[in-house]
């Protein structure tokens, strides 16, 4: 399980999470899309900068 803050210009990552992971929560905020999800470790390694 991870909590991520995805910038709007990388919104395609949310679609990836929907298709490849388990999306638990999604919240559109001023600074990006907050996502709580179950994703694989390779995804987290690649996107460490998005973890909150």
Task: Put a short name on every predicted segment.
Residues 1-52:
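C-terminal-of-GTPase-core extension/linker across diverse P-loop GTPases
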């Amino acid at each position: 399980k991870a909590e991520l803050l995805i910038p709007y210009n990388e919104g395609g990552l949310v679609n990836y999470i929907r298709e490849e992971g388990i999306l638990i929560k999604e919240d559109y905020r001023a600074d990006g899309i907050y996502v709580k999800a179950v994703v694989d470790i390779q995804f987290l390694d690649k996107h460490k900068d998005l973890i909150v």
